[in-house]
Amino acid sequence: MRAEARGGLERFCSAGKGRGLRALRPFHVGDLLFSCPAYACVLTVGERGHHCECCFARKEGLSKCGRCKQAFYCDVECQKEDWPLHKLECSSMVVFGENWNPSETVRLTARILAKQKMHPERTPSEKLLAVREFESHLDKLDNEKKDLIQSDIAALHQFYSKHLEFPDHSSLVVLFAQVNCNGFTIEDEELSHLGSAIFPDVALMNHSCCPNVIVTYKGTLAEVRAVQEIHPGDEVFTSYIDLLYPTEDRNDRLRDSYFFTCECRECTTKDKDKAKVEIRKLSNPPQAEAIRDMVRYARNVIEEFRRAKHYKSPSELLEICELSQEKMSSVFEDSNVYMLHMMYQAMGVCLYMQDWEGALKYGQKIIKPYSKHYPVYSLNVASMWLKLGRLYMGLENKAAGEKALKKAIAIMEIAHGKDHPYISEIKQEIESH
């Protein structure tokens, strides 16, 4: 079957980038270019009981799977629809009990294998790009990444051998490599992780640090909307990474995860880098070497914190945030992205500890520089306004709360579309207060 065109869009060969997606007609800011159902998706373990395992709907009073008591559903329809995939895990979770711990990548890959068996022909998620056409970048993997794939394959065999037929070992290596660079994480309106999925047609889009579209989720459906004016013949670009950081950091991340260096306008001009790594205005300004050392320290502390999250207590994590901010503030302005990173982490710890005043204090410092560093329509900025609005509302400051929530809505109406359930929920929060 030939890849059919999606309305007003075509697959093409993009110079120096391989395959890409191109517009055949104009799209205006806020227009939906296309939507793509998940080829396969899996709800993250931590959200069980809060979201339906099948459609990812967030609601109270979900029904529990009677066998494993771990999966929750809206109703019998969702449970029935999910059964061919849930059965891969249901009895295994009961048998292994506490020892059932496949990674999310393994869980998603198991579902892809099951889907390929059940539905060998092309699916509605693959109008322009089929899963089997995904890039694997196998030749570029370092030993650490290869080892990770081997341990994922071992876990796949350990937890899924009863209900799945596996292809040969080398095909599994390719599949895991494909999932690693083509998978998506589904996030909610506050950018909390909900699950992982494969959206083949969305994966066709190439990356830019000044993207002209944004990807959002409605349940397990991915939606792609314009955040800049798009003209016929323009390539459609999304962003694969968090755009907060300076050019060198962004490209380190892109090379590590996706094996390319970006050459977009932002990366060639480095226009925003100076403001992103803002240095304190002192009568005796820091020397270039002191700045370089502090940037190195900042990158190290970000990595150290990422690892510490898995084993340190909230109060220890907060201490890392506070000490690192204190050290960096001798050279960096508060609007510096490395300072903002640690403030954001500190805010997250405060939210976890239900220290609402502490979280609000950090959020208030973050929001203005965020709005400057990120593109105009940014989910990071929208989710920060949303968190601030909800904190104000919870602390009985209705005027500030309403103002912040309306700022979030203004961005989300473009990024998520005016009819998104998240937006009606937020409007409801404003009215009910």
UniProtKB/Swiss-Prot annotation:
It catalyses: L-lysyl(4)-[histone H3] + 3 S-adenosyl-L-methionine = N(6),N(6),N(6)-trimethyl-L-lysyl(4)-[histone H3] + 3 S-adenosyl-L-homocysteine + 3 H(+); L-lysyl-[protein] + S-adenosyl-L-methionine = N(6)-methyl-L-lysyl-[protein] + S-adenosyl-L-homocysteine + H(+). Keywords: Chromatin regulator, Cytoplasm, Metal-binding, Methyltransferase, Nucleus, Phosphoprotein, S-adenosyl-L-methionine, Transcription, Transcription regulation, Transferase, Zinc, Zinc-finger. The gene is Smyd2. S-adenosyl-L-methionine binds at residues 17-19, 137, 206-207, 258-260. One of its GO terms (molecular function) is zinc ion binding. A zinc finger (MYND-type) spans 52-90. Belongs to the class V-like SAM-binding methyltransferase superfamily. GO terms for cellular component: cytoplasm; cytosol; nucleus. Residues 7-241 form the SET domain. Interacts with RNA polymerase II and HELZ. Interacts with SIN3A and HDAC1. Interacts (via MYND-type zinc finger) with EPB41L3. Interacts (via SET domain) with p53/TP53. Interacts with RB1 and HSP90AA1. Protein-lysine N-methyltransferase that methylates both histones and non-histone proteins, including p53/TP53 and RB1. Specifically trimethylates histone H3 'Lys-4' (H3K4me3) in vivo. The activity requires interaction with HSP90alpha. Shows even higher methyltransferase activity on p53/TP53. Monomethylates 'Lys-370' of p53/TP53, leading to decreased DNA-binding activity and subsequent transcriptional regulation activity of p53/TP53. Monomethylates RB1 at 'Lys-860'. InterPro entries: H3K4_H4K5_MeTrfase, SET_dom, SET_dom_sf, SMYD2_SET, TPR-like_helical_dom_sf, Znf_MYND. Its EC number is 2.1.1.-, 2.1.1.354. Zn(2+) 2 binds at residues 65, 68, 86, 90. This is N-lysine methyltransferase SMYD2. GO terms for biological process: heart development; negative regulation of cell population proliferation; negative regulation of transcription by RNA polymerase II; peptidyl-lysine dimethylation; peptidyl-lysine monomethylation; regulation of DNA damage response, signal transduction by p53 class mediator. It is an enzyme of class 2 (transferase). The modification Phosphoserine is found at residue 283. It comes from Rattus norvegicus (Rat). It is found in: Cytoplasm, Cytosol; Nucleus. Zn(2+) 1 binds at residues 52, 55, 74, 78.
